[in-house]
Amino acid sequence: HAGQAGEVATDALRYVCDCNHYDAVKMAIFENLVIEGLGGAEIIVEKKGKYLDVVVKQTRWETVFWDGHSRRKDFKDANHMGHATWMYVEDIEVLYGEKAGKVAEDSLAGVGVGGLAWGSYDDRPTVGQWLDYKHKRVLVVDMYCKYKGRWTRSLFCNGGDLIEPMVSEYTDEFGEPVCPIELASVYVDRENARYGLVRGMIGPQDEIN
């Protein structure tokens, strides 16, 4: 029976990897590790009709953020991490409901919770930018944070929460909430900055310049 259970588990993992084109995802993450020094993925569950699918999504290095005090290469000492993504207001309503859509719409109308905002024409989040008036988009932050020792999730934009903050839906084998984002880095310097192999190829004089 133990052997059969092992085969079932192996088949299940192989199925998840095949559905997510895992080899391609791994290569993309590896490229981020080598060049930018940081790579990872978010392992989540998505409902598709009456089925639940395990989805492995690469976290783009330019959109992800983490606890600046984290020193471990696997980020296991981080107290928060997440990613910031530009989203159209209409897509927010489809994904998170009418109330969330209203919060995003209010952001563009100037009813936000604060912070600076400019009309952005860039698809990559920039410090200080929360709103893209031209394309009716808002910067959506999906953040997992340890609160009283438990991982919680918040999803918000400049206008406020898009969903109610909650304990993470994902748990470990002991039933404890976990963060579904897995990150890794190649090197960590004394200032906790992450970097990859490419930085070591830069000559001393070029680095000074």
Predicted ranges, named:
Residues 1-209:
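Extended alpha-helical, oligomerization-prone segments that build pores/tubes and scaffolds
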